[in-house]
C-alpha cells in the first residue's frame, strides 16, 4: 500500500515534473514558434504594403531581388506603353500642323503646335501666323495713315495746351487789341490831361475846325471867312498829325468834353451876365462896348492864345463892315450874325444907318451873348440852338434901324 502511493506520487511528480518541464518546453517552443512565425509573417506581409510607399532596403536585400525587377520593369513597361500612345498623338498632331504649316519639321513644330492649339483651340496654329502678319499690316496704318494712338495722345496734349492758351494769352491778345484800337487807360489819361491843362489847345482845335464847317458859306462873303479859314489850317495841323484811329478817337472825345465844359461855363457866365447887361442899357455904347468885348473875348481867351484871338477879332471886324451893308438874314449863317453884332458893338460909328439908339444897345449886348451861346453851341448844334434863336437873330439884323425897347428880354430868357 505504501509503494502504490509512492509510485503514484512519483508518477505524479514525474508526470507533474515532466508535465511542467514539458509544458515549459512546450511554452518556450510555442513562444519561439510564435516569435518565429510572426517574424516570418510580417516579412512576408510587410513588403507588399511597404513597397509602394517606400521600398525598405532590408526587404529589397531579401526580397528586393525578386520584387525590385518587377518594380523596375513595371515603369519601363508603362513608359513603353505610354510612349507609343504619346508618339501616336504626337504623330497625329504633327501631321495636322505639318500640313497646315509648310516647311516645318515634323517633330519640333509638332511639339510647338501642341502648345498652340491647346491655348488657342479654335484658331489652330495657322491663325497665330495669320494674326501676326495682319497685326503688322494693321500697325502701319494705325501709326501713320490713321493714327488713333497718336491722335488720342496729341488730342489730350492739345486740349491741355489749348486750355492754357485760353487762360493766359487772352490777356495778351486783349492788350494787343487795345493797343490797336487804343487802350482805355490811355483814353482816360488823355481825357484827364485834356480836362486839366490841355483843354485850351483842344479849344483851339474845336473852334476853327468846326467854325470851318459852318463857315463854308462864308466863301463869297468877304474877309471874315478868310480870317476864319486862315486860322483853320493854322490850327488844324495837330489834327493832321494824328493818322491813327486811337488819336482821332481821343481828340473826338476831348472835343466833346471841351464842348460840355465850355457849355457849362458859358451858360453860367450868360446867366450871370444877362442881368448886368440889361441894367447897363442906358449907359453909353462906349462903356458897353468894352464890356461886351471883354465878355466876347473872355470865353475865347480862355481857350486859344491871346494873340490868335486878337487877330481873329481884327479880321472879323474888317469883314463885318462889308457884311453889315451887303449880307441879309437869308445868307447869314449863325456865326456871321453873331460876329456882325459883335462888330457893331465894337465900332459904333460904323453901325448901320439907323444911328445908335438906346434900343440898339440891348440888341448889341444880346448879340454878344448870342455870340457866346453860339461859340458854345456851334460844334454840337445842341437843342438849345433851335430855329427860335436863328429867327430872333435874323429879326435883329433884318430890322437894325427900328428901335426896339427892352421887349426882347423875355425872348432871351426863353432862349436861356
Curated annotation (Swiss-Prot):
Annotated function: Stress-induced phosphorylation of CAPZIP may regulate the ability of F-actin-capping protein to remodel actin filament assembly.
One MF annotation (Gene Ontology) recorded for this entry: actin filament binding
Oligomer and partners: Interacts with CAPZA2 and CAPZB.
Key words of the record: Phosphoprotein
Pfam families, sorted: CAP-ZIP_m, RCSD
Annotated region described as Disordered, given as residue ranges: 1-84, 98-416
Tissues expressed in: Highly expressed in skeletal muscle and more weakly in cardiac muscle. Also expressed in several lymphoid organs, including spleen, thymus, peripheral blood leukocytes, lymph node and bone marrow.
Modifications after synthesis and translation: Dephosphorylation results in its dissociation from CAPZA2.
Ranges of Polar residues composition bias in the record: 8-20, 382-397
GO cellular component: actin filament; cytosol; early endosome; WASH complex
Signal sequence range: none
The protein, known as: CapZ-interacting protein
Species of the source: Homo sapiens
Modified positions (Phosphothreonine) in chain numbering: 124, 336
InterPro entries, per the entry: FAM21/CAPZIP (IPR029341), RCSD (IPR007850)
Location of the RCSD domain: 227-330
Basic and acidic residues compositional bias, start-end: 244-273, 292-349, 360-372
Modified residues (Phosphoserine): 17, 68, 82-83, 105, 108, 116, 120, 123, 126-127, 135, 143, 177, 179, 216, 244, 267-268, 284, 298, 333, 351
Matches recorded under PANTHER family: CAPZ-INTERACTING PROTEIN, CAPZ-INTERACTING PROTEIN AND RELATED PROTEINS
Biased composition (Basic residues): 159-176
GO biological process, one term: protein localization to endosome
